[in-house]
Amino acid sequence: MTKTEKQRIDFSDAKRFKAEYEAYFSALKYFAFRYIEDEEVVCDLLQDLFVKLWERGEMFENEMVLKAYLYRSVRNNCLTYIRDNRRREHRLAEY
């Protein structure tokens, strides 16, 4: 087994998935809350992100790549939510 294979993070492994979920959820929640101050929405966005990781069985080369991916994904998901919410509010205001 090579060094790269030892570092690889495989989200199709249930134990590894649970460990990473527990390790990152609180920090990602705090990070997302800086964009969206609604705890329920933030938790939904994070849940969706982790469900996608689980369903796809994502693999990451190492912890740094995983961390960067998670934070970038949370940021993008928050910005998408904000954009969509503004559009929805704008359409409702037109009526």
Model-identified regions with their sequence ranges:
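Conserved catalytic core of Hanks-type protein kinase domains
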Residues: 23, 35, 72-73, 81
